[in-house]
């Protein structure tokens, strides 16, 4: 075993019995350490705290490939997240590699087939069209997707990652990529304990000439979730997701837009979901831009609108970000955001509990990111 330093890519572990095999197989250790100081006004309750993952989630992982000959490769990736402020695992503490854990085969001519816990095709569609790249802590898009809202508790959200999944990804067809995923039932603990049903997730993206476009369709089968304070488990209704994303670069400005509509099935008459009215459909729209002001400075801005159908429940939110690169691996950043809940809406930054429906949140943070 020997170490090879690849700079930004981190340290590479080459596992081989001899010199010839060393050129055919590799394992790369990589990661991100991100910490920030945050001010939050949560419905009039003010607080200061240290947080992890404000720009990019703090993480580390291992990925590797083996050349099998004839253009065929075996590959794997295992990746976990952690809180740099206390050293604990991030979010789902029951899973060691909660971010990614998959293995598969790839071929430059035919594409790749992978199995395990992996990013969904629909997430791959949205990410390039969100200025904050669907960050789990401070992206306003993620705040709206992950909102724990009474009117939509039974409407399944698009989580971004799927366990027990198998996915095909086509090769790059002159800018066009196709994705198809099927995931079997899985149990999760975040943001609430739940068992999701099987899921079909398909997508297509195109990138070229400064233009990006993506479409995705998701069909999630029914499941169950546990909500504190309810006498029994709550049904997760079968939910369809329709997602579109666009981006266009004009000089130093990259304009970005995405829209998603989550359509839930009607709850069974007499069920707890029907009695509580937790199965409303909803839409999320985001418009923003990324501005590369200088080679070292980027400005990001986004506005998001979440609307729940059939209820007085909507939440406009805005966020501004500035990132300054000190080196290829180290950067400083600032974020300032605002969420206004209207009616019964309870949208919040991930990990923050809303003090009461209809309240606002104001957030400001400064932090540092280092990649290895």
Regions from the language model: what does each represent?
Residues 35-41, 80-84, 119-121, 182-186, ...:
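Transmembrane beta-strands of outer-membrane beta-barrel pores
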Residues 24-40, 48-184, 196, 205-209:
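Outer membrane beta-barrel
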Residues 27-35, 70, 74-78, 113, ...:
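Transmembrane beta-strands of outer-membrane beta-barrel proteins
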Residues 201-319, 335:
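Detector for outer-membrane/organellar transmembrane beta-barrel domains
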Residues 61-63, 102-105, 167-169, 203-205, ...:
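Outer-membrane beta-barrel architecture
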Residues 326, 358-372:
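Outer-membrane beta-barrel "beta-signal"
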Residues 17-20:
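N-terminal signal peptide c-region/cleavage motif recognized by signal peptidases
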């Amino acid at each position: 075993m020997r170490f090879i330093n690849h700079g930004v890519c981190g340290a590479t572990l080459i596992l081989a019995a001899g010199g010839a095999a060393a050129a055919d197989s590799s394992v790369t250790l990589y990661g991100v350490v991100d910490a920030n100081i945050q001010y939050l006004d949560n419905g009039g309750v003010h607080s200061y705290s240290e947080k992890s993952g404000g720009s990019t989630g703090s993480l580390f992982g291992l990925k590797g490939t083996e050349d099998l000959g004839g253009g065929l490769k075996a590959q794997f990736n295992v990746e976990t997240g952690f809180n740099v402020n206390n050293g604990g695992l991030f979010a789902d503490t029951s899973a060691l590699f909660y971010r990614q854990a998959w293995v598969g085969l790839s071929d430059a001519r035919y594409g790749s087939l992978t199995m395990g816990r992996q990013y969904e095709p629909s997430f791959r569609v949205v990410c390039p069209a969100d200025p904050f790249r669907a960050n789990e802590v401070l992206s306003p898009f993620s705040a709206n997707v992950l909102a724990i809202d009474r009117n939509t508790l039974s409407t399944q959200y698009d989580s971004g990652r799927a366990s027990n999944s198998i996915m095909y990804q086509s090769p790059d067809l002159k800018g066009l990529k196709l994705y198809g995923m099927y995931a079997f039932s899985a149990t999760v603990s975040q943001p609430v304990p739940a068992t999701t049903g099987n899921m079909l997730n398909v997508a297509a993206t195109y990138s070229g000439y400064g233009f990006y476009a993506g479409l995705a369709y998701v069909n999630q089968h029914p499941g169950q979730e546990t909500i504190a304070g309810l006498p029994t488990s709550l049904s997760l209704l079968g939910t369809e997701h329709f997602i579109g994303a666009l981006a266009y670069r004009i000089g130093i400005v990259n304009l970005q837009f995405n829209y998603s509509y989550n359509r839930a099935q009607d709850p069974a008459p007499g069920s707890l979901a029907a009695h509580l009215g937790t199965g409303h459909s909803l839409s999320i729209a985001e418009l923003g831009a990324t501005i590369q002001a200088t080679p070292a400075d980027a400005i990001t801005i986004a506005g998001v609108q979440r609307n729940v159908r059939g209820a007085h429940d909507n939440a406009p939110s805005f966020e501004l970000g500035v990132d300054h690169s000190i080196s290829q691996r180290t950067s400083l950043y600032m974020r300032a955001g605002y969420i206004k809940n209207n009616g019964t809406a309870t949208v919040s930054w991930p990990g923050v509990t809303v003090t009461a429906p209809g309240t606002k949140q104001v957030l400001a943070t400064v932090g540092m990111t280092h990649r290895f």
